[in-house]
């Protein structure tokens, strides 16, 4: 039988996210819907709160940086949870049946908290600094040195293209090796928080003839002169969240 009750360990997180939706997001939701492209300054406090919860382990893995991938492909639990050191799988809480493990605790905590904040305002939820799709990608696959360098910075994700949509296996943006550098050329659209973020994780292909196997992701500084902002979209909804379009023109990245 499917149990639809919220696990007890997540109840405090859900209540806190619900309070944020009611007390922070709802009062300013209409304001930022009308003031499209204006950054919601209230989110600075929200992001600081999330950072503090993540650092303390109180978030139970919620948030972009809350879950990394173990070598076996399971979600690694945050440091404060009871997890097996070898697999990163959360052990059963006291009182639960032996043999049961939670392989998706971080995903569940993120989903439950996002459900609450989206009730407050979807656009504001998508605009929380350091909680972008790019941050989730960095947390999931970056090495320790990359996490140290980029972990505390806001990262957007650039996958979608005008001619391919979000079909990642058909990406046309290219990354060409040139000595110690990669040179990226192409176009990206529908980049959530692309103009506001400090970094953009760009998906590009090393060789179009190889299909998905040649698709790689590159962390690009938003200030890189080769990453040119074309426009911010004017939308019918979710207007508190900016959606950007970029052109990459001979964007140079040093291969480290």
What residue ranges belong to the model's regions?
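Amphipathic, small/basic residue-rich leader segments at the start of a protein or domain
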Residues: 1-128, 149
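Flexible, small-/acidic-enriched active-site or ligand-binding loops
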Residues: 225-250
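Short Gly/Pro-enriched turn/cap motifs at secondary-structure boundaries
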Residues: 102, 127, 163-166, 190-193, ...
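A structural signal for short hydrophobic beta-strand segments in well-ordered beta-sheet cores
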Residues: 175-176
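A short, Trp-centered hydrophobic/proline-enriched beta-strand micro-motif
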Residues: 152-161
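Conserved small/polar residues in nucleotide/adenosyl-binding loops
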Residues: 254-256
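A short core secondary-structure module
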Residues: 181, 185-228
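N-terminal glycine-rich flavin-associated loop
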Residues: 96, 114-115, 122-145, 165-168
């Amino acid at each position: 039988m499917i149990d639809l009750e919220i696990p007890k360990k997540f109840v405090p997180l859900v209540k806190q996210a619900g309070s944020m939706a009611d007390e922070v997001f709802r009062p300013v939701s209409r304001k930022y819907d009308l003031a499209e492209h204006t950054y919601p300054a209230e989110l600075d406090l929200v992001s600081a709160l999330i950072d503090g919860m993540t650092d303390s382990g109180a978030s139970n893995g919620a948030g972009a940086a809350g879950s990394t991938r173990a070598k076996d492909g399971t979600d690694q639990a945050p440091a404060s949870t009871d997890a097996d050191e070898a697999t990163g799988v959360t052990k059963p809480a006291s009182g639960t049946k032996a043999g049961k493990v939670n392989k998706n605790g971080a995903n569940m905590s993120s989903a439950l908290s996002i459900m609450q904040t989206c009730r407050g305002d979807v656009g504001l939820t998508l605009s929380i600094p350091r909680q972008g799709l790019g941050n989730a990608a960095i947390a999931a696959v970056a090495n320790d040195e990359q996490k140290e360098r980029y972990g505390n910075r806001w990262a957007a994700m650039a996958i979608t293209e005008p001619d391919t949509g979000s079909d990642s296996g058909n990406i046309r943006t290219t990354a060409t090796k040139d000595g110690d550098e990669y040179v990226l050329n192409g176009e990206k659209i529908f980049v959530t928080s692309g103009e506001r973020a400090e970094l953009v994780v760009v998906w590009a292909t090393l060789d179009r003839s190889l299909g998905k196997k040649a698709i790689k992701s590159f962390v690009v500084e938003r200030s890189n002169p080769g990453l040119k902002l074309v426009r911010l979209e004017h939308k019918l909804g979710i207007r508190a969240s900016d959606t950007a379009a970029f052109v990459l023109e001979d964007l140079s990245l040093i291969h480290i």
